[in-house]
A protein has these predicted regions:
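Short, solvent-exposed mixed-charge patches
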Residues: 108-110
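Thiol/selenol-based redox catalytic cores and closely related redox-interacting motifs
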Residues: 1-103
Length: 110
């Protein structure tokens, strides 16, 4: 692990950002955004089979689709901000642009 990566892990993988050190996963997106753990309640997937989850992903009104696809869209928008909206075929999508606009209003202190 490089020194810069080690510094990121040391900062974000410890209180007050997590209950205790070792609370992975966390994602750092280009130093712009850090997401700690999942952005939805894992209980929404509890007791579902892989087939049920797959079927639910096909229904945009399902809790599973809203959780998983919504989270993916947030990660995509954050990545687009970090890459200067590249690739435009993805980053130019209306949904992603709308989420980007919201993300850009978030004030973060480090």
């Amino acid at each position: 692990m490089t020194a810069s990566i080690s510094a990121i892990v040391s900062k974000w993988d410890s209180p007050p950002y997590t209950a205790q050190a070792g609370q992975f996963p966390f994602i750092d997106i280009g130093g712009y955004f850090t997401l700690l753990n999942t952005s939805y309640d894992p209980a929404d997937l509890a007791n579902l089979t892989w087939n049920q989850i797959g079927n639910d992903l096909s229904d945009p009104t399902s809790t599973v689709a809203k959780d998983v696809i919504g989270n993916a869209n947030i990660l995509t928008a954050a990545t687009c901000i970090a890459t200067g909206d590249t690739p435009s075929s993805v980053c130019g999508m209306a949904t992603i642009q709308s989420i980007e606009a919201g993300l850009k209003t978030i004030k973060v202190t480090t």
